[in-house]
Design a protein with these regions (language model features):
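N-terminal glycine-rich phosphate-binding loop for ADP-containing cofactors
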Residues: 1-316
Length: 318
């Protein structure tokens, strides 16, 4: 089956969803970016006498998330002119529009039950044969594919982008148990030729390849701080550009990834790999759990290990 990708639907407009939408727009693809509708009005909407049925309210989440992404640095998009390639909408009003998409990418929160609800919507509205992929950073595809139709699973895989999607080179592809071999080949080649990535075929193992290694490295250093061996400043000075790695080093990288995402991936590994010789490394330290509880999730909430004040980053002492 010859495939041509002229329109992509991205379901979920968070930091990854909006970033992926921008990167497809960068290469000339039309994008439909959707997210959920709010469950209640904010103060501004109340003052304007809007209702939950108002279009502005229904699109509030996707608008806010996308605008935040566009303003982020480094820019997720090559040119502001490319923004017009991205259409915004919500699941209630616009989900039927995925029928015309050549590729549907799920990028919602890392909870299996929520992803399954999104897959139900996709099954209802997609055109048979359409590619469906998940950007999960660690949920096994064998679990996500349960209960899905034969056509869905034949065209289903994980395509794991790394944050930020425009800049990070790795692109992991994990096929569903019944994935069509031609689709798998297509995704790997598309990642290389059009998305500008290094495509890697990974097995359906906990956290795949990149996050299994990366999470181990980050968590190892978290425990160094917990044990009082090093400070955050010392670790970031020693694990950044001085050794040829990005200047975000360890703790700033964790902020970019999202501390809640980091905990989710770590927990998935901890629960699934009991025989791993270093399993205790994946058990998050108490200070990390406390930060997430206080909504200090990193870049997505404006504070994590670092807090942005105007154009400068200041370290928050934990």
């Amino acid at each position: 089956m010859k495939r041509n990708i002229s329109k992509v639907a991205v379901l979920g407009s968070g930091i990854m969803g909006s970033g992926i939408a921008c990167h497809f727009a960068n290469i000339g693809v039309e994008v439909l970016l959707l997210d959920i509708c709010p469950s209640e009005l904010n103060e501004s909407e109340k003052q304007k006498n809007l209702s939950l049925d108002s279009k502005a309210v229904k699109n509030r989440i996707v608008n806010e998330m996308f605008n935040k992404c566009i303003k982020s640095k480094p820019s997720p998009i090559y040119s502001k002119n490319f923004i017009k390639r991205i259409k915004l909408g919500n699941f209630d009003d616009d989900i039927s529009k995925i029928k015309s998409a050549d590729w549907i990418i799920e990028v919602v929160v890392e909870k299996l039950e929520i992803k399954q609800k999104v897959f139900d919507l996709i099954e209802k509205h997609r055109t048979p044969g359409t590619i469906v992929t998940s950007n999960t950073s660690g949920i096994p595809i064998k679990l996500m594919s349960k209960g899905r139709s034969d056509d869905f699973n034949k065209n289903f895989a994980i395509t794991h982008f790394f944050n930020p999607p425009r800049y990070l080179n790795l692109f992991e592809v994990i096929p569903s148990p019944n994935c069509d071999k031609h689709l798998l080949s297509f995704l790997l080649k598309y990642g290389e030729k059009y998305l500008g990535k290094t495509s890697i075929l990974a097995k359906d193992t906990p956290a795949f390849i990149g996050n299994r290694i990366g999470t181990f490295g980050i968590q190892s250093l978290f425990h160094q701080v917990k044990n009082g061996d090093y400070t955050i400043e010392e670790i970031d000075k020693l694990t950044g550009s001085i050794i040829g790695r990005p200047k975000s080093a360890t703790f700033r990288t964790a902020d970019v990834v999202g501390l809640d995402t980091l905990i989710s991936v770590s927990k998935g590994i901890y629960d699934s790999c009991k025989n791993d010789e270093s399993i205790e490394i994946f058990k998050e330290p108490d200070f990390l759990k406390k930060m997430v509880k206080n909504n200090a999730l990193g870049s997505k909430t404006g504070k994590g290990f670092y807090k942005k004040i105007k154009d400068n980053l200041s370290l928050i002492h934990i």
